Amino acid sequence: MAEVEAAPIAAAETPEVAAAEGAAAAKAPHKLHRQWAFWYDIQSKPKPGAAWGTSLRKAYTFDTVEEFWGLYDQIFRPSKVTVNADFHLFKAGVEPKWEDPECANGGKWTVPCSRKTTLENMWLETLMALIGEQFDESEEICGVVASVRQRGDKLALWTRTASNEAVQVNIGKKWKEIVDYNDKMVYSFHDDAKREKPSRGGRYNV
């Protein structure tokens, strides 16, 4: 049987070229699965007749890991926020308003945070879980809101389909693990919150 000569190593397979390609890849932006947008709402005393959300502003839309860390480190930490302010991270194209089509039939899981360090840690863990697509029901999630208030801070995870109890409970359980929260977490419908006397007990809990 005739011997078959081994094919010469292609230039692209040499250690030098592979190392150069690896170094270039390490410097390249790390793309996320989808685009996200940071929003903020610095609330002053509203003018008579002003509609809710008039102070809400979109700050930046991003789709790389590097952009996320730059925005978070420089701006979007709760410790950098004054009282009566909100930070939002929502999927690009979704506004953090009840009226948005993606949010209109949804609701939110809410977690109270008694200390700034707790809020900051929970906020960061939630942000990383969202942009890292750690939720099995990630298509159901709209975004998250960090609210800094004198009477107590809180986080709220907004979802799309409030009536789907099984999906919302799964999301709530996963979020509870992510933020390492041990007390009861409640879910409320946006429709309930629009009423003059919304239910304080929530629709679901985990």
UniProtKB/Swiss-Prot annotation:
Q: Does the keyword Disulfide bond apply?
A: yes
Keywords from the UniProt entry: Disulfide bond, Initiation factor, Protein biosynthesis, RNA-binding, Translation regulation
Biological process annotations from GO: negative regulation of defense response to virus; regulation of translation; response to virus; translational initiation
How does it get modified after it is made? According to the redox status, the Cys-103-Cys-142 disulfide bridge may have a role in regulating protein function by affecting its ability to bind capped mRNA.
Which SUPFAM superfamilies does the record associate with it? eIF4e-like (SSF55418)
- One matching Pfam family is IF4E
Superkingdom, according to UniProt? Eukaryota
Which parts of the chain are coiled coil?
A: none
GO CC term, one of those recorded: eukaryotic translation initiation factor 4F complex
Disulphide bridges? C103-C142
Q: Which GO terms describe its molecular function?
A: RNA 7-methylguanosine cap binding; translation initiation factor activity
Question: Its biological function?
Answer: Recognizes and binds the 7-methylguanosine-containing mRNA cap during an early step in the initiation of protein synthesis and facilitates ribosome binding by inducing the unwinding of the mRNAs secondary structures.
- What family does the database annotate? Belongs to the eukaryotic initiation factor 4E family.
Listed under subunit, the entry gives:
EIF4F is a multi-subunit complex, the composition of which varies with external and internal environmental conditions. It is composed of at least EIF4A, EIF4E and EIF4G. EIF4E is also known to interact with other partners. In higher plants two isoforms of EIF4F have been identified, named isoform EIF4F and isoform EIF(iso)4F. Isoform EIF4F has subunits p220 and p26, whereas isoform EIF(iso)4F has subunits p82 and p28.
Name-wise, this protein is Eukaryotic translation initiation factor isoform 4E-2
